[in-house]
Amino acid sequence: VRAPRGATAVFAAAVALYFVAVVHRTSLGVAGVEALDRFGTQATGLAMLSVAQVAMYAAMQIPAGHLLDRLGPKRVMIAGGVLMAFGQAAMAVTDSFALAIVARVLIGAGDAPVFISVSRLVAAWFPPRRVPVLVQLTGLLGQSGQLVSAVAVAWVLHGLGWTPAFSVLAVIGLVVAGAAAFRVRMPEAREQVTTAAPDRLWVAVRASAATAGNRLGFWSHFLTPFSANVVALLWGVPFFVTAQGRSTGEASALLVVLTIAAMLSSPVTGVLTARHPLRRSWIVLGSALTTALAWVLLLAASTPRPFWQLAVFCAVLGAGGPISLVGLDFARSWSPSARLGVASGYVNIGGFASTVIGVLLVGLVLELASPAGASSYTLDEFRLAFAALALPWIVGLVGVLRSRRLTRADLAADGVIVPPV
């Protein structure tokens, strides 16, 4: 089955907006050292800048999904693009910590509907068998926005300064949102977003959360991306520069490695998900165990690591990030179209909830383990702080195993038996 005419143009415009959203989302990660000086804060304060953004993103997932079900993807994603641009403009001009928190909240709120809107457009425009691969392709292209943050944003920031860097991001965000407004639409036969009226918000939320397959999606999304997010969104550059003794250029290069690994992992994950739908949970578990091993090997050493080992570590974390999108594939499998937006939002909360927990844990442990007033941290302090990430990892692993058992029971009730590996 071929996609309708115009599908590629719509997909390109939507992905461009998601690409810019990822640049907005990750821009603070390359500015962590500068943010400590600009806002006169310490580790917990710096963590709060990232947490405010990610927590708002997570909190807005279900409302954004409900708006998506009612209004369609175009309106909500364009509104999101404009909000993010306003947030970056505020970041450009303020040196107030309180206003910076507000700016990051705007960015998180604007970012919230973008990916699930692109996923809805893909499901509407393309044949079902192509959807998992195209959603992973969306993630791959979006991850290149993280590459832009690691290289281009870092270059502008270090060359021209804080205000020009964030001002440029604001202008680009408005331009891309305007371009998407002209190109993004639903197929003519699907202009009415759903054939059935959307459920009320909390009816849809309860129905989504009550479905074991959706809970498996939530916990899969919770478990897999937070390690990469903690490194890319905030703590990677300070760790590489102050604890591992790397230059800012080398730290940016390590974030590039993380991003490229994610981009290479995305299409492979999409193909495996499409070809082996009954093995999706094993993909999640394999990724989680590999990521845990990478952390253990890094944190076991009490001295700075050679660049190649840091690069391998970043590659493993980056490759695990796109596995989180398997969670959204569970939502598509277990949710009717009338509440797919809410179900996708519910699942998408998982990874960003674990990211909030992870970023806060690292910041809190760093501040407790370091001398009062410290604004840079030692390797031993970072080792202790990163070890705290075992907590969300264990919670996520238990969640995946339990919800997988319940999901397989539901499948068995429908006559579908998952064979042993």
Region locations from a protein language model:
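Conserved MFS/SLC helix-loop-helix module at the cytosolic interface between two early adjacent transmembrane helices
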Residues: 59-98
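Helix-to-loop junctions at the C-terminal end of transmembrane segments
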Residues: 60-72, 265-279
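Cytoplasmic membrane-interface "Motif A"-like loop-to-helix N-cap segments
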Residues: 70-80, 274-289
